[in-house]
Amino acid sequence: MKIIKLEKQMGDFHLNIAEMNLEPGLIHGLVGANGCGKTTLSKLILGILSPDSGTIDYEGLTARDITMTSQKPYLLHDTVYQNLIYPLKIRGIRPDEAEVDRWLSRCGLLEKKMQYARSLSSGEQQKLSFIRALIFEPKLVIVDETLSNLDPDSTELFEELMLEQQKERPITWITISHQLVHIKKICDKVHFLEKGMQIAEGTPEEILLRPEHPLIQRFLANTEVSYQKQEQSLADLS
């Protein structure tokens, strides 16, 4: 997928992506401070928003090939099972019951298959939302802050699922996260946004470990200070 001269004005915010290459089959990380345009860009890619100008070359992908998971799981008022097979039903795909059970078992939800989704914990709802996005074998998955409120075990599970799917078939991932440990661990390529513009792209090592751009250096320094304050607060509580 290639983005060229993409612009979107929303109030005082102006997204202006001169060029961005989202190579197929890779895990791409969108990084930057709050309000830099990460979610706006993802909505433009999904077609939820229309650009004011510029182009997104999907290189053969259609809306049926693209899906998204977000920080808030949007689930049907129905059972876990019906939620999971919903993407299959709307695409006219007959559910493979063994495959459905495999996904549920992988996330520890098999015994809750016929329970209503609203009875699940918030973490379990997030797991259900995540595997629902994968069950129909999409070609592009956008993960928008899905991991932000998860415990370490659930975060590790999601990362394992992403890497497993990457090996099984060539999915293109776009993951948006403030968890730089996650970005460093799982991404093939990082795109750094600042005030609606992409100011750098490269490997996690190039962007997050050896950044040349002063704005990225400052962002990483501020992030490190924030982490240190959190650790000190936890130490004070213990």
Segments predicted by a language model, with ranges:
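The feature captures the beta-strand-to-loop junction immediately N-terminal to the Walker
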Residues: 31-33
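Helix-to-loop junction immediately C-terminal to a conserved catalytic motif
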Residues: 46
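Conserved ABC ATPase "signature" region
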Residues: 97-112
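Conserved ABC ATPase signature
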Residues: 116-120
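H-loop/switch region of ABC-family ATPase nucleotide-binding domains
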Residues: 177-178
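A short, surface-exposed alpha-helical micro-motif characterized by mixed small hydrophobic
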Residues: 183-185
